[in-house]
Protein backbone atom coordinates (compact mmCIF):
# COMPACT_ATOMS: atom_id res chain seq x y z
CA UNK A 1 0.00 0.00 0.00
CA UNK A 2 2.82 2.39 0.81
CA UNK A 3 4.46 1.61 -2.54
CA UNK A 4 1.17 2.51 -4.23
CA UNK A 5 1.10 5.85 -2.39
CA UNK A 6 4.72 6.69 -3.10
CA UNK A 7 4.51 5.73 -6.78
CA UNK A 8 1.33 7.74 -7.19
CA UNK A 9 2.83 10.79 -5.51
CA UNK A 10 6.04 10.46 -7.49
CA UNK A 11 4.13 10.32 -10.75
CA UNK A 12 2.27 13.45 -9.74
CA UNK A 13 5.44 15.30 -8.77
CA UNK A 14 7.18 14.12 -11.94
CA UNK A 15 4.45 15.48 -14.19
CA UNK A 16 4.94 18.89 -12.61
CA UNK A 17 8.66 18.83 -13.39
CA UNK A 18 8.52 19.90 -17.04
CA UNK A 19 11.45 19.21 -19.33
CA UNK A 20 12.35 15.76 -18.02
CA UNK A 21 12.27 12.72 -20.26
CA UNK A 22 10.06 9.78 -19.29
CA UNK A 23 13.17 7.76 -18.48
CA UNK A 24 14.52 10.46 -16.17
CA UNK A 25 11.16 10.73 -14.46
CA UNK A 26 10.92 6.99 -13.94
CA UNK A 27 14.46 6.85 -12.53
CA UNK A 28 13.61 9.68 -10.15
CA UNK A 29 10.42 7.91 -9.12
CA UNK A 30 12.14 4.73 -8.11
CA UNK A 31 15.17 6.36 -6.50
CA UNK A 32 17.39 3.52 -7.62
CA UNK A 33 14.93 0.79 -6.59
CA UNK A 34 14.39 -0.52 -10.09
CA UNK A 35 15.41 -0.55 -13.73
CA UNK A 36 13.67 1.36 -16.50
CA UNK A 37 13.04 -0.51 -19.74
CA UNK A 38 10.87 -0.39 -22.83
CA UNK A 39 7.39 -1.85 -22.36
CA UNK A 40 6.99 -4.89 -24.61
CA UNK A 41 4.34 -6.61 -22.50
CA UNK A 42 1.12 -7.94 -24.11
CA UNK A 43 -1.75 -5.47 -24.16
CA UNK A 44 -4.49 -6.09 -21.59
CA UNK A 45 -7.64 -3.92 -21.55
CA UNK A 46 -7.83 -1.91 -18.35
CA UNK A 47 -11.42 -2.92 -17.66
CA UNK A 48 -12.56 0.43 -16.29
CA UNK A 49 -13.98 3.58 -17.83
CA UNK A 50 -14.26 6.66 -15.70
CA UNK A 51 -12.47 9.54 -14.05
CA UNK A 52 -11.76 11.10 -10.68
CA UNK A 53 -9.51 13.61 -8.95
CA UNK A 54 -6.95 12.80 -6.28
CA UNK A 55 -6.41 15.40 -3.56
CA UNK A 56 -3.08 14.80 -1.83
CA UNK A 57 -1.71 16.50 1.27
CA UNK A 58 1.80 15.79 2.56
CA UNK A 59 3.10 16.63 6.02
CA UNK A 60 6.59 16.65 7.51
CA UNK A 61 7.03 17.11 11.23
CA UNK A 62 3.35 17.92 11.50
CA UNK A 63 3.65 20.82 9.04
CA UNK A 64 1.73 20.83 5.78
CA UNK A 65 4.05 20.83 2.76
CA UNK A 66 4.11 24.14 0.89
CA UNK A 67 3.00 22.45 -2.34
CA UNK A 68 -0.06 20.86 -0.71
CA UNK A 69 -2.74 20.21 -1.59
CA UNK A 70 -1.78 18.66 -4.92
CA UNK A 71 -4.65 17.80 -7.25
CA UNK A 72 -4.40 15.17 -9.94
CA UNK A 73 -7.22 14.50 -12.38
CA UNK A 74 -7.16 10.96 -13.74
CA UNK A 75 -9.14 9.41 -16.58
CA UNK A 76 -9.33 5.84 -17.88
CA UNK A 77 -10.78 3.64 -20.57
CA UNK A 78 -9.72 0.19 -21.73
CA UNK A 79 -6.83 1.52 -23.82
CA UNK A 80 -5.78 4.78 -22.14
CA UNK A 81 -4.87 6.54 -18.95
CA UNK A 82 -4.56 10.31 -18.61
CA UNK A 83 -3.01 12.25 -15.73
CA UNK A 84 -3.56 16.00 -15.44
CA UNK A 85 -2.16 17.84 -12.40
CA UNK A 86 -3.90 21.07 -11.49
CA UNK A 87 -1.96 24.00 -12.88
CA UNK A 88 -0.76 26.55 -10.35
CA UNK A 89 -1.24 30.30 -10.85
CA UNK A 90 1.08 31.80 -13.49
CA UNK A 91 2.28 28.36 -14.56
CA UNK A 92 1.65 26.32 -17.68
CA UNK A 93 -0.50 23.22 -17.79
CA UNK A 94 0.54 19.62 -18.38
CA UNK A 95 -1.19 16.38 -19.23
CA UNK A 96 0.26 12.90 -19.61
CA UNK A 97 -1.45 10.31 -21.81
CA UNK A 98 -0.59 6.62 -21.62
CA UNK A 99 -1.62 4.73 -24.75
CA UNK A 100 -1.66 1.22 -23.30
CA UNK A 101 -2.46 -0.55 -26.57
CA UNK A 102 0.14 1.12 -28.79
CA UNK A 103 2.77 1.32 -26.02
CA UNK A 104 3.48 5.04 -26.35
CA UNK A 105 3.16 7.93 -23.92
CA UNK A 106 2.55 11.60 -24.55
CA UNK A 107 3.58 14.53 -22.39
CA UNK A 108 1.52 17.56 -23.43
CA UNK A 109 2.35 21.08 -22.26
CA UNK A 110 0.61 24.42 -22.60
CA UNK A 111 2.74 27.41 -21.65
CA UNK A 112 1.59 30.66 -20.06
CA UNK A 113 0.98 32.17 -23.52
CA UNK A 114 -1.18 29.27 -24.66
CA UNK A 115 1.39 27.59 -26.91
CA UNK A 116 0.81 23.83 -27.05
CA UNK A 117 3.67 21.41 -27.48
CA UNK A 118 4.21 17.77 -26.66
CA UNK A 119 6.58 14.83 -26.69
CA UNK A 120 5.78 11.31 -27.87
CA UNK A 121 7.91 8.55 -26.35
CA UNK A 122 8.00 4.80 -26.02
CA UNK A 123 6.13 3.42 -23.03
CA UNK A 124 8.39 2.48 -20.12
CA UNK A 125 8.14 -0.16 -17.44
CA UNK A 126 9.91 -0.45 -14.12
CA UNK A 127 11.49 -3.73 -13.06
CA UNK A 128 11.48 -3.72 -9.27
CA UNK A 129 14.32 -5.17 -7.23
CA UNK A 130 14.02 -7.87 -4.59
CA UNK A 131 14.64 -5.57 -1.62
CA UNK A 132 11.66 -3.39 -2.44
CA UNK A 133 9.34 -6.34 -2.85
CA UNK A 134 10.55 -8.02 0.32
CA UNK A 135 9.21 -4.98 2.16
CA UNK A 136 5.92 -5.10 0.24
CA UNK A 137 5.47 -8.78 1.06
CA UNK A 138 5.78 -8.08 4.77
CA UNK A 139 2.91 -5.59 4.79
CA UNK A 140 0.09 -6.63 7.13
CA UNK A 141 -3.35 -5.73 5.76
CA UNK A 142 -6.58 -6.12 7.75
CA UNK A 143 -10.08 -5.83 6.27
CA UNK A 144 -12.23 -4.56 9.14
CA UNK A 145 -15.99 -4.63 9.67
CA UNK A 146 -16.18 -0.84 9.95
CA UNK A 147 -17.84 1.07 7.12
CA UNK A 148 -18.82 4.62 6.27
CA UNK A 149 -20.38 6.37 3.29
CA UNK A 150 -18.18 8.58 1.11
CA UNK A 151 -19.74 10.28 -1.93
CA UNK A 152 -22.69 7.85 -1.87
CA UNK A 153 -20.41 4.78 -1.80
CA UNK A 154 -20.31 2.47 1.20
CA UNK A 155 -16.61 2.17 2.00
CA UNK A 156 -14.89 -0.43 4.14
CA UNK A 157 -12.03 0.39 6.45
CA UNK A 158 -8.70 -1.35 5.86
CA UNK A 159 -5.61 -0.99 8.02
CA UNK A 160 -2.09 -1.74 6.85
CA UNK A 161 1.31 -1.76 8.49
CA UNK A 162 4.93 -2.62 7.75
CA UNK A 163 8.33 -1.64 9.06
CA UNK A 164 8.19 1.72 7.28
CA UNK A 165 4.84 2.92 8.56
CA UNK A 166 1.12 2.30 8.88
CA UNK A 167 -2.11 3.61 7.49
CA UNK A 168 -5.85 3.47 7.06
CA UNK A 169 -7.69 3.18 3.75
CA UNK A 170 -11.41 3.49 3.06
CA UNK A 171 -12.30 1.45 -0.02
CA UNK A 172 -15.49 1.49 -2.10
CA UNK A 173 -15.72 -2.22 -2.81
CA UNK A 174 -18.69 -1.74 -5.14
CA UNK A 175 -16.47 0.04 -7.68
CA UNK A 176 -14.89 -2.64 -9.86
CA UNK A 177 -11.54 -0.96 -10.29
CA UNK A 178 -8.18 -1.96 -8.90
CA UNK A 179 -5.74 0.95 -8.90
CA UNK A 180 -2.90 -1.52 -8.37
CA UNK A 181 -3.70 -3.01 -11.77
CA UNK A 182 -3.75 0.39 -13.45
CA UNK A 183 -0.43 1.43 -11.92
CA UNK A 184 0.85 -2.08 -12.58
CA UNK A 185 0.88 -1.28 -16.30
CA UNK A 186 4.03 0.70 -15.50
CA UNK A 187 5.70 -2.06 -13.50
CA UNK A 188 7.83 -4.71 -15.13
CA UNK A 189 8.71 -8.31 -14.39
CA UNK A 190 6.95 -8.46 -11.03
CA UNK A 191 3.79 -6.62 -11.95
CA UNK A 192 1.89 -9.65 -10.67
CA UNK A 193 2.49 -8.43 -7.12
CA UNK A 194 0.39 -5.36 -7.91
CA UNK A 195 -2.37 -7.76 -8.89
CA UNK A 196 -2.16 -9.44 -5.47
CA UNK A 197 -3.64 -6.46 -3.63
CA UNK A 198 -5.86 -7.80 -0.81
CA UNK A 199 -8.96 -5.98 -2.04
CA UNK A 200 -10.89 -4.96 -5.10
CA UNK A 201 -12.32 -1.48 -5.27
CA UNK A 202 -11.68 2.25 -5.34
CA UNK A 203 -9.58 3.82 -2.60
CA UNK A 204 -11.70 6.81 -1.57
CA UNK A 205 -9.54 7.92 1.36
CA UNK A 206 -6.06 6.87 2.40
CA UNK A 207 -3.74 8.12 5.14
CA UNK A 208 -0.21 6.83 5.73
CA UNK A 209 2.14 7.76 8.59
CA UNK A 210 5.81 6.85 8.74
CA UNK A 211 6.99 4.62 11.58
CA UNK A 212 8.82 7.50 13.26
CA UNK A 213 5.80 9.78 12.93
CA UNK A 214 7.74 12.37 10.96
CA UNK A 215 5.89 12.01 7.66
CA UNK A 216 2.23 11.72 6.78
CA UNK A 217 0.45 11.52 3.43
CA UNK A 218 -3.32 11.93 3.09
CA UNK A 219 -5.10 11.15 -0.16
CA UNK A 220 -8.78 11.43 -1.05
CA UNK A 221 -10.71 10.65 -4.22
CA UNK A 222 -13.17 13.26 -5.43
CA UNK A 223 -15.47 13.83 -8.45
CA UNK A 224 -15.73 10.11 -9.18
CA UNK A 225 -17.48 9.32 -12.49
CA UNK A 226 -18.02 5.71 -13.55
CA UNK A 227 -18.95 4.36 -16.98
CA UNK A 228 -18.14 7.41 -19.08
CA UNK A 229 -15.13 9.61 -19.73
CA UNK A 230 -14.22 12.73 -21.70
CA UNK A 231 -12.33 11.26 -24.67
CA UNK A 232 -10.69 14.65 -25.25
CA UNK A 233 -8.42 13.84 -22.32
CA UNK A 234 -6.80 11.14 -24.46
CA UNK A 235 -6.41 13.38 -27.54
CA UNK A 236 -3.29 15.18 -28.77
CA UNK A 237 -5.21 17.40 -31.21
CA UNK A 238 -3.88 20.95 -31.32
CA UNK A 239 -0.43 20.09 -29.96
CA UNK A 240 2.84 20.38 -31.87
CA UNK A 241 4.40 16.98 -31.16
CA UNK A 242 8.04 15.97 -31.14
CA UNK A 243 8.33 12.25 -31.90
CA UNK A 244 11.09 10.69 -29.79
CA UNK A 245 10.04 7.06 -30.14
CA UNK A 246 13.15 6.24 -32.18
CA UNK A 247 15.50 7.26 -29.39
CA UNK A 248 17.16 4.47 -27.39
CA UNK A 249 16.03 3.81 -23.84
CA UNK A 250 18.79 4.96 -21.51
CA UNK A 251 19.43 3.91 -17.94
CA UNK A 252 18.70 0.21 -18.31
Show the residue positions of the predicted features.
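Bacterial Sec-dependent N-terminal signal peptides
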Residues: 1-22
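Extended soluble regions of mature proteins
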Residues: 21-252
Amino acid sequence: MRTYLILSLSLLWATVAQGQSNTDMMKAIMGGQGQVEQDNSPFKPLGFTGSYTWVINSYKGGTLDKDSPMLLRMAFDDEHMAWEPQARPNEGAMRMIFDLKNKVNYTLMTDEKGKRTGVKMKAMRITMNDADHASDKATQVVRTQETKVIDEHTCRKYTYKDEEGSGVAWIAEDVKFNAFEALGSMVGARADRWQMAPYQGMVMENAWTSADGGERVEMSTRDLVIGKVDKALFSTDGYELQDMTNLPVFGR
